[in-house]
Amino acid sequence: MNFPWDQLLVKGNWMITMAQIGAPFLVIGLIAVITYFKLWKYLYKEWFTSVDHKKIGVMYLICAVLMFVRGGIDALLIRAQLTVPDNKFLESNHYNEIFSTHGVIMIIFMAMPFIFGLWNIVVPLQIGARDVAFPVLNNVSFWLFFAGMILFNLSFIIGGSPAAGWTNYAPLAGEFSPGPGVNYYLIAIQISGLGTLATGINFFVTILRCKTPTMKFMQMPMFTVTTFITTLIVILAFPPLTVALALMTTDRIFDTAFFTVAHGGMPMLWANFFWVWGHPEVYIVILPAFGIYSEIIPTFARKRLFGHQSMVWATAGIAFLSFLVWVHHFFTMGNGALINSFFSISTMLIGIPTGVKLFNWLLTLYKGRITFESPMLFSLAFIPNFLLGGVTGVMLAMASADYQYHNTYFLVAHFHYTLVTGVVFACLAGLIFWYPKMMGYKLNETLNKWCFWFFMIGFNVCFLPQFILGLDGMPRRLYTYMPSDGWFLLNLISTIGALLMAIGFLFLVVSIVYSHFKSPREATGDNWDGLGRTLEWTTASAIPPKYNFAITPDWNDYDTFVDMKEHGRHYLDNHNYKDIHMPNNTPVGFWIGIFMTIGGFFLIFETVIPALICLFGIFGTMIYRSFQIDHGYHIPAAEVAETEARLREARIKEREAVSHES
């Protein structure tokens, strides 16, 4: 076993050197704080080993916000480099590393855990379930994601980051990228992807088997419907990525030749594998985002969602078509006119079900009694901005025109108008919307609105000029340009917009900190002035009790909770409580994550024997779990009755306070 010590430390860049010096101090400081406040046992027992879907969701969201910061810093470094012509702020390879990691982090390690965090917190509550179908697997899934996240971020200070773009095309990612950088990409995404696939299976089964028996599919909230359909995409799309990553890993570590032309390999095989996963991946993050908008818009329009069934069918149509469009990512790679024509038409067809959704949201707003809370502001801003992303997407879908737009900043502007407005706006809106359900208090609305205005205006200032830059011929992934190119002014404006977005995000961080200390606590559950329309708002706030629902709720219409409130009924009015069975916490996922992180690290540096030892550790942990007799535990009916009585009393007091104010 010869570990490549000479590849361990990245040298020659002042930013990386500062990170290498600062990272140990950050870790030591974090350990010191946890030790000082004696939190190790609490964190391990209550969080790291928890199988409670709500706590797992919170851990996903914490990771997602941290990765938002990391990906945002990458974006600011990119904009700093391109602000002025002939800039020497970053050298070319470091710039390549930054735009590569920016894409991976924002898609894989920010957007997906943000969505999965909201799935975990909201979906079981929306369907009347006490937990997900496989609670232990849910914990394992999180730690697989966490292991991948740690490994990928470790690359910045140990070994070097991948520099072949977020698409990691062969042969650039093969023989032309020596060192551990691309290995970090392959192993980290592989480990995280296993967790994602397990999450998809888990929530697919949860929605099918754990929902309240009276809830029919067409009566489910749209966030749950979009989650269910997205899990199907996850189950079908991630295996091709898993295969592609495994093949390239064997190419790099074991000298196979799946993608090496000199030995009979096919680089285009990677492009097809990647985009067979890559374009459905866009809908893996954007369909749940559509579900978030479909919850927020009816709530603050005080109206039933228009065309609920057509929204369900439109979501299914988008999911189906998402597997028929991947070639539009490489129209210029010599596919031929017939193939390009087919994929051009199939790409345009996605605009039809997407248009159905847009019109349904607009018709929901029509004659609604709209109030402009911050989640609603993000949702309203999404519609026109996403429309611009969709229209430019149709332009790019025209294969002949794509030869002009391909690999220019026009494409960069397009997919940011699609993903930032479609996903990031939704994540921020969803976080603010369901934050009181998680924490028991709302985020400060004034600070939230400052966040919205800075972020939304900054977004348009940043990316609108990039359409013009692309039409003017500026290639993407260009690390510098000459004054004679004439791109300085628009790049300067774009950088100013990025700074405004960063300020907007800082307002959200300030809102989270400020609200923790200052916002009034709300334990009753229906936190947005009694406007809740779905089952999660019937439960208590501040992470509802472990069992979620004391009795199985009845649900016989899309807006049953609205009808219940209008007639003064509540599912808690039934006092016939029984003992509730719950699963025990388990350390299995945590230790699998530890073994995956250590084994993945050694495999990245092509040191196979320690990686195999860690693999045996993973199998040993799984075998230990298989032979463990764990029947869970029961919450006594008396304890349930006491908890529900407290919640009922708090709800009555809140109703009396509201009546007194009115």
Swiss-Prot record:
Binding-site residues, Cu cation: 279, 283, 328-329
GO biological process: electron transport coupled proton transport; oxidative phosphorylation; respiratory electron transport chain
Presence of keyword Membrane: yes
Any one GO CC term of the record: plasma membrane
Cofactor-binding details, from the entry: Binds a copper B center.
Subcellular location: Cell membrane
Documented EC number(s): 1.10.3.-
Membrane-spanning ranges: 14-34, 58-78, 103-123, 140-160, 187-207, 228-248, 273-293, 311-331, 336-356, 376-396, 415-435, 451-471, 493-513, 587-604, 608-627
Principal EC category: oxidoreductase
Keywords: Cell membrane, Copper, Electron transport, Heme, Hydrogen ion transport, Ion transport, Iron, Membrane, Metal-binding, Oxidoreductase, Respiratory chain, Transmembrane, Transmembrane helix, Transport
Cofactor(s) required, per the database record: Cu cation; ferriheme a
Binding locations of Fe(II)-heme a: 102, 416
Record field: catalytic activity: 2 a quinol + O2 = 2 a quinone + 2 H2O
GO MF annotation, one: oxidoreductase activity, acting on diphenols and related substances as donors, oxygen as acceptor
InterPro entries: Cyt_c_oxase-like_su1_dom, Cyt_c_oxase-like_su1_sf, Cyt_C_Oxase_1, Cyt_c_Oxase_su1_BS, QoxB
Protein origin, superkingdom: Bacteria
Pathway terms, separated by semicolons: Energy metabolism; oxidative phosphorylation
Cross-link (1'-histidyl-3'-tyrosine (His-Tyr)), chain numbering: 279-283
Similarity annotation: Belongs to the heme-copper respiratory oxidase family.
Task performed by this protein: Catalyzes quinol oxidation with the concomitant reduction of oxygen to water.
PANTHER family: CYTOCHROME BO(3) UBIQUINOL OXIDASE SUBUNIT 1 (PTHR10422:SF35), CYTOCHROME C OXIDASE SUBUNIT 1 (PTHR10422)
Protein name: Probable quinol oxidase subunit 1
Organism: Staphylococcus aureus (strain COL)
Gene: qoxB
